[in-house]
A protein has these predicted regions:
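Alpha/propeptide regions of enzymes that mature by internal proteolysis
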Residues: 19-171
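Bacterial Sec-dependent N-terminal signal peptides
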Residues: 1-24
Length: 171
């Protein structure tokens, strides 16, 4: 776990010290792979490399969007979509199961400048909950939707809906 923090610090440092951004506002990207415990003693070198590569790729996605003058919201959404789509992390595919053996997902987004916010909670079928949270912020009068109402809203918004089996992976 210590190596992950070191990698994140190095990546943030390289983002803020890039000569291509002279005269522009510096930025950093900080990510994590979800809640839970991953013990180094239980991880092979190959497995650790897989986790590190996925985390690094997620940061690169957001970095490239910002580097190309993209929107911060898009950088956050695409970075988190990547993590949600990876079975290695506890966000989206690969999530921890409830006591009933199902997956319930939460996501939230806030724009620090405007203070606009959107969130979804206890969703079961939205492939990328962060995208649903952003849709709540942009396309509804609400700040948060939960459960079936949030799943229905996401479907109405054209987001990808998947079966519960999509999220369940072997660990």
């Amino acid at each position: 776990m210590k190596k992950i923090y070191i990698l994140i610090a190095i990546i943030i440092s390289s983002c803020t010290n890039n000569k291509n951004f002279e005269g522009k506002i510096n930025f950093g990207i900080v990510i994590h792979g979800g809640a839970g415990t991953i013990l180094k003693k239980n991880m092979t070198e190959e497995m650790e490399r897989m986790y590190m590569n996925q985390l690094e790729e997620a940061v690169k996605i957001g970095y490239q969007i910002i580097k190309n003058n993209g929107d911060g919201k898009d950088a956050v959404e695409k970075t988190i979509n990547y993590l949600e789509d990876s079975p290695l992390f506890n966000a989206g595919k690969g999530s921890v199961l409830t006591n009933e053996g199902t997956v319930e997902l939460d996501a939230s987004f806030m724009n620090g400048k405007s203070l606009d916010a959107g969130a979804v909670a206890s969703v079961k079928f939205i492939k990328n909950p962060i995208s649903a949270a952003i849709k709540v912020m942009k396309n509804s009068p609400h700040v948060m939707l939960s459960g079936k109402g949030a799943d229905d809203f996401a479907k109405e918004q054209g987001l990808e809906i998947v079966d519960q089996n999509y999220f369940i992976t072997e660990r």
